[in-house]
């Protein structure tokens, strides 16, 4: 359902496909204007040649300590914009850093009394800033949207109600034409897509999802631009919205739990991954019959179970990951089964949720979807798909007519972008989670694991590992590539790497 607000001025939008934003990959080698670069593609501008080998001691142009945060570098010219989080001081921080010197040009702080509740491996500073070359736009889920000029002067701010989600918001703003687009579909309390006038912070239009009796999943995805549309991946599916009016033009229903990745665009085609908890054949949950649950956990013999009775029944969300924070007991996710909210699970609720899990398994996978249609695209617009070893948090990469995805546990898959043929599926030689998304330059792909290992592979039809670089610190942020440099954020430091 779309709500219209006053249009302050005529919005002119032009361009096509990946070049559809107000700038393109040919705009120059010195921009990486939002999460994952131009239109979230993950691809550096032509002729970029970042280093292959690097570490905290090798090929370091500069490094600078930063507070905790998962946002990625946003770059325009000699300016890097990035955010941080100070939990003790209850501060959210915004930085402008001199790209050549690694010195802070300005720092802004806002005090927040109550931070959004997030996953233990996350924090309230996850959104990557976006810029148009004149102003920079910061989003914090615990505060809202703020706009600064390059001198650090606040131009406007837009409070956004704190979202309610399972893990904390993961989306980032994008700028196109005169609009800042913000995906708030992850809000369980008011899911909506916002288009904001970048000049004054007024809301131009918003599209609200219809309210449902039952929670259907969060959206952590960042919007991408296709021609005169904005594409957003939400729990209901991937949809295209008219940039001028906010009307929903089409929808591709998916129906998995959460919308996590950011789609990427190819030749009139969109590629997205739809992850389902333990959806791979060898990881699917084999839930016992409810009679076994009753026999083992029903202490008061009422043929139902409550949270206290199942506090030790463990469900592995990601069994291929070694991180204990990714493990859950039934008590922790009790609400997923307790559909009538009476704080009890009975046999009907148990069986219904298990059937729901089974349907999620069937819908997961990487998918290639033909663009250009209207209405419901679910039946005739899928070009190909593959259900196995799907990436969880990291987004796919479309590069040189191939599509790559990185699975937690260190598994890379490569597909022909047109036919969907699996060209290879191999182990990268490092395990654990992959929160950062792959980026590409000069025929190479840079893949950062959360354990601090950055793997450089050659793009092509077979796996060729060129280098493995150990940063010795956690990596959750996606790297940026500008001016033959690799800008990489770890848990404590922002690095600029170049050939020395």
Identify the residue ranges that each predicted region occupies.
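Intrinsically disordered, low-complexity Ser/Thr- and Pro-rich stretches
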Residues: 6-7, 396
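Positively charged n-region of N-terminal signal peptides that target proteins for export
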Residues: 1-5
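Noncatalytic, solvent-exposed loop/strand surfaces
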Residues: 23-500
């Amino acid at each position: 359902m779309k709500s219209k607000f006053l249009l302050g001025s005529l919005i002119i939008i032009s361009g096509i496909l990946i070049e559809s934003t107000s700038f393109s990959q040919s705009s120059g080698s010195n921009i990486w204007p939002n999460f994952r670069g131009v239109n979230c593609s993950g691809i550096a501008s032509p002729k970029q040649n970042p280093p292959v080998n690097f570490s905290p001691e090798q090929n370091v142009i500069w490094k600078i300590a930063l507070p905790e945060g998962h946002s990625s570098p946003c770059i325009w010219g000699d300016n890097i914009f990035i955010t941080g989080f100070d939990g003790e001081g209850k501060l959210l921080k915004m930085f402008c850093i001199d790209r050549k010197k690694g010195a802070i040009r300005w720092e802004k702080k806002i005090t927040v009394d109550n931070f959004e509740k997030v996953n233990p491996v996350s924090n309230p500073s996850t959104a990557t800033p976006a810029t148009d070359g004149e102003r920079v736009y910061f989003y914090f889920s615990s505060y809202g949207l703020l706009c600064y000029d390059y001198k650090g002067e606040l131009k406007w701010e837009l409070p956004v109600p704190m979202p309610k989600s399972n893990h904390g918001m993961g989306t980032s703003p994008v700028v196109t034409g005169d609009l800042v687009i913000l995906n708030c579909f992850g809000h369980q309390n008011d899911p909506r897509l916002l288009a904001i006038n970048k000049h004054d912070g007024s809301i131009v239009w918003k599209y609200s999802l219809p309210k449902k009796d039952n929670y259907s999943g969060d959206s952590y995805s960042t919007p991408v631009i296709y021609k005169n549309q904005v594409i957003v991946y939400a729990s209901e599916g991937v949809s295209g919205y008219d940039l001028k009016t906010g009307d929903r033009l089409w929808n591709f229903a998916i129906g998995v739990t959460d919308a996590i990745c950011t789609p990427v665009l190819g030749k009139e085609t969109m590629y997205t991954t739809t992850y389902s908890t333990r959806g791979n054949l060898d990881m699917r949950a084999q839930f016992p019959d409810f009679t076994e649950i009753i026999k083992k956990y029903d202490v008061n013999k009422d043929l139902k179970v409550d949270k206290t009775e199942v506090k030790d029944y463990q469900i592995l969300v990601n069994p291929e990951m070694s991180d204990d924070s990714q493990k859950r007991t039934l008590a922790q996710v009790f609400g997923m089964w307790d559909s009538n909210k009476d704080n009890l699970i009975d046999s009907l609720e148990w069986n219904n949720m298990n059937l729901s899990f089974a349907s999620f398994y069937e819908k997961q996978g990487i998918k290639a979807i033909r663009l250009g249609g209207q209405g419901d695209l679910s039946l005739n617009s899928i070009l190909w798909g593959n259900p196995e070893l799907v990436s969880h948090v990291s987004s796919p990469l479309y590069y040189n007519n191939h599509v790559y995805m990185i699975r937690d546990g260190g598994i890379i898959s490569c597909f022909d972008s047109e036919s969907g043929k699996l060209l290879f599926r191999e182990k990268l030689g490092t395990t654990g989670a992959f929160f950062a998304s792959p980026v590409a330059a000069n025929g190479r792909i840079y893949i950062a694991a959360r354990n601090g290992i950055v793997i450089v592979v050659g793009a092509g039809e077979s796996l060729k590992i060129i280098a493995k670089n150990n940063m010795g610190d956690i990596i959750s942020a996606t790297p940026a590539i500008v001016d033959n440099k690799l800008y990489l954020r770890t848990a404590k430091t922002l690095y600029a790497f170049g050939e020395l």
